[in-house]
Structures are given as structure tokens and as C-alpha cells.
Amino acid sequence: TFYITWSFPNRKAWSSVVVGNYYSNQYPDAWKAAETIIPQIPGLENKTLSFINALLGTSYPEVVKEAALFNLATLRSQTVFRLPSGHMMGWEGVMDRFGSCEGSCTHVWNYETATPYLFGELAKTMRDVEFNYATKENGLMNFRASLPLSEASKGNNPAADGQMGCIMKIY
């Protein structure tokens, strides 16, 4: 068995601005990541299998189970990432070399419902970005949060469906 670990602390934002990666706060280098995570792999695998078996053991139609599992894979892809502050951010999708459509677009991410149920604390970081960083003083919420977070309310216009969806998620 062999493992490949990495450490790329200098993640770029939606532009050329460097915003960093959350994991670089947790592990100073790839070696430390390996030392810490490799011993946890059996437990993580067991938790994953327990979750999958619980879902597959339900009475939901097969097509629903398949759709749920396929869509959950997005959460472990390059579509999402965490800033050093711990805030979860997301692209609308990914291409070969970079993400597609930046800014955790509110009227796209409103349709993603797995994170609040499976990773509630991560979902709260997305709400924090939407309401405390991407909302302008006049109450309009940018539908794409700029990075760094200090710039999140600059630029893009609001989208009614995005802002209303964010309000519903808080409710």
C-alpha cells in the first residue's frame, strides 16, 4: 500500500489573488498530513460504508438512492474548497484546469441540500459568507461572493431566487 499526499497552501481565488487552503492550517506539509490522516483511514472507511449501507438499506426507489449517492460525490471533488478561515466555497462545476462559474452562486447552491444535513457546521460557513460578507449595506446579496472575503459584497448583482433561497435556508 502506498499513499499520495499533498500540500498546496497557495490556492488562488476566482482570480489571481491567493486566498489559501483550510488544510494548510491543519497540516504544515504533506508529510504531516500523511502522519495524521493515514492512521484514521480505517475509521473513515467504516463511517463511509455505514452511511452508504444505511442509505442503500432504505425503502427509497433505486433511482433515488443512485441520484443521492452520485450527487454527494460533488462534496469530495474540486467543486468545493475551504478557505483558511474554514468557510466553504464552491464553483458551479469544474473543468480540466479550473473551476466554472465562481462565487458559491446562490441561485445554484440553493439546490444543494446535502451539506446542511451531513455537514451542518460547513453549511453554516456558507450562510456566514452569504449574509455577513456578500450582503451589501442596502440589503442586496451578491449572487456570487468575491474573494478574498473582504471583497465578497463587491461586484455582482443580486439574484432574487438566490437571496430568497438563502433566507429560506436560514429559516
Indicate residue ranges for each PLM-predicted region.
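A broad, low-amplitude sensor of folded, mature protein cores
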Residues: 2, 13-16, 114
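Short, solvent-exposed loop/turn and secondary-structure capping segments
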Residues: 9-17, 125-129
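Substrate-binding groove/exosite segments of carbohydrate-active enzymes
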Residues: 25-171
